[in-house]
Curated annotation (Swiss-Prot):
Residues 37-208 form the Helicase ATP-binding domain. GO terms for cellular component: cytosol; ribosome. InterPro entries: CsdA_RRM, DbpA/CsdA_RNA-bd_dom, DEAD/DEAH_box_helicase_dom, DEAD_box_RNA_helicases, DEAD_helicase_DeaD, Helicase_ATP-bd, Helicase_C-like, Nucleotide-bd_a/b_plait_sf. One of its GO terms (molecular function) is RNA helicase activity. Keywords: ATP-binding, Cytoplasm, Helicase, Hydrolase, Nucleotide-binding, RNA-binding, Stress response. The gene is deaD. Residues 564-601 are annotated as: Disordered. GO terms for biological process: cellular response to cold; ribosomal large subunit assembly; RNA catabolic process. This is ATP-dependent RNA helicase DeaD.
Amino acid sequence: MTHTESTFSFLGLNPFIIKSLSKMGYVKPSPIQAACIPLLLEGRDVLGMAQTGSGKTAAFSLPLLHNLNINLKAPQILVLAPTRELAVQVAEAFSDFSKYIMGIHVLPLYGGQRYEVQLRALRQGPQIVVGTPGRLLDHLKRGTLNLSNLYALVLDEADEMLRMGFIEDVETIMSQIPKEHQTALFSATMPEAIRRISKRFMKNPQEIKIQSNITTRPDIKQSYWMVYGRKTDALIRFLEVEDFSATIIFVKTKNATLEVSEALERNGYNSAALNGDMNQALREQTLERLKSGRLDILIATDVAARGLDVDRISFVINYDIPMDSESYVHRIGRTGRAGRAGRALLFVENRERRLLRNIERTINQTIPEVQLPKIEVLCKRRLERFAKKVQEQLESRDLDEYSALLDKLYSPDDLDIKTLASALLKMAQGGRPLIIKKDLLQRPSREFSFKDDRRREDNHRNNNRNRRERRELKDIDLYRIEAGRNDGVEVRHIVGAIANEGNINSRNIGNIKLFSSYAIVELPKGLSKDLLQRLIKTKILNKKINIKLLRDIKNYETRTHNRSIFNKDKNNKRRFSDNRLNKSSSIKNETKSSFFRRKSV
C-alpha cells in the first residue's frame, strides 16, 4: 500500500478518531501524515521538515492521541509552539480530533492569561498541554506543571522558536522531562541549532522531508498590506479604488462575516454574509444573487465558501489571514476564473508576519507589499464615478421636466448657473465627499513599520545577544521594565517575552541593559497603544514588567551612570563628593554606544 493509496482507516487509528476525521471531511492523509503517523504510532522519534499548511498538526496529534491513556489524569503529551495563536490552534486541533473520545482534556498555556485561570485548569489534570516556551518554563519553575507522566514531546515550528529567541528556554524544558519519552520535532528549515537539539535530545530520529507542491496560478496578482488603524476603514478604502466585478472577503469567524457585512452596508455597499449558520435555501439564494450580478460583495468563512465557484469574482480579500498556507491558496483560487485575470489582497497584522513568511515559503513566491491608497487616488476615483453618473443623467430623456422645476426654485437673476451647480454637487456627494482635506487613515510618521523580513535562517542574527548591533538612536525609544537580576531575569527572558507577547520580531529589539531591579530596553519608535497595553500586562518569571517609555534618552543616560557610580561607592560618600565633578565629566564624554552595550552591570 503506497502513501497515495492509503486512507486514515488503514493507518490503524482509534475508530473514534476516524469518526472525528470523517465528520471533519478528512479522507486521505497528506504526504507528511502518511509518513509520520505509522512511525509515531510505533513510538519512534520523528524529525519532520514540512511547511505550515502541509497537515503536520494532524501528523503528530492523531498518533499521539491514539496512544494516550485516558484514565490517567495528568499531562502525557506536551507541545511547544512559538506563539499563542499557534498554541491555541494546535489545542483546538487536539480537541476536534478527540471529539468522540470521552475524558480527554486539552489545555493551552500562554502568556497574557491570568495564572489563576491556568492553575485551576492544571488542577483538573489535562492529558495534553500545548504552550509557549516562556509560560511553560514559568509553570515548571513554580512547580505547577508536573511532567513526570509525560510520554510524548512535540516541538512545532522549531525554527520559528529559534528565530524568536526561545531556543534556550526550549532546551531547559527538554532537560527537565523524563528521559523515557517520545519526541517529534517539526521545522520548515533545519538550521544548525535545531540540528544540534535533535542530536542531543532525540533517539535515532526518523527524518521525514516533504517538499511543498502547492502553487498559485500566475494570472492572480497577489499583494499584502501591513495593518494599522481600523481594518474596516482600510477595507472600504481598498474597495473604493479597486476595479472589480465581484469580490469575496474571507474572515475567520461567523460573527466576523456579520460585522464586516454590516460595516459595508453602512457605507453604501451591497454585501452579504455567508457562514455556517445559514440554511441551504438562503445560501443558494445568496450565491445566485452573486452569480447574476445583483450582489457584488460576499463575506465568508473558509468552511462556508467550500465548493463556491463564481466566474465573475475578480478580487479576493483575505481580511483575516489564514492559519495555514493551503487555505490561502484555496481562497485566492476563487478569482481569475474562466480566463480572467484575478487580484488577491492579504491583510497582515504585525503579529502575523510569521504566517506571511510561511505562505511565501509554501508557494515559493514573494508577495509584494502595497500601501494604503492615498487620498489623491481616492478623490480621483470618486470624481470619476460621480462624473459617470452625471453623464448618464445628461443622456436621460426627462431633463426638461427638471429644468422647469429649477425655474420655479430660482430665477436666473438670483444666482448664476455655476454657483447653483456647485451647491447641487456638494449636496449630491452624500457620505463620500469628493474633496478630502485630511487623510485620517494614513500611517502616522512616528509609527513603526515592520520592514519586509524574508532572510532565511542562515542569515539569522548571532545567538550571542550581547553582540547585537546597535540601531541608530533616532529609530528607537527607551523603555523601562520592572524586572531585573534580583528577580532571576536574564536578557534572553526579556527578548523572548517581548518577541512573543508583543509579537515583535526579535531582530527589532535593540540593546538591553540589565540592573538589579529593572532593565532598560531599546524598542522601535511608534509602538501602538494596543501593543504597549499587551506588554504592560506581560510577566517575566511571574513578575509583571509594567513597561514604561522613557522620554528623555540623553538625560536618562547621564542619570543612570551617576546612580550606578553612587551605588558602587555608597560607603564612601566623601570620596564620591570629591571626585563627583571629574566622574560626571567623564560620563558626559562617554559615547552612547558604551551605555547601550547589552550586558549586565
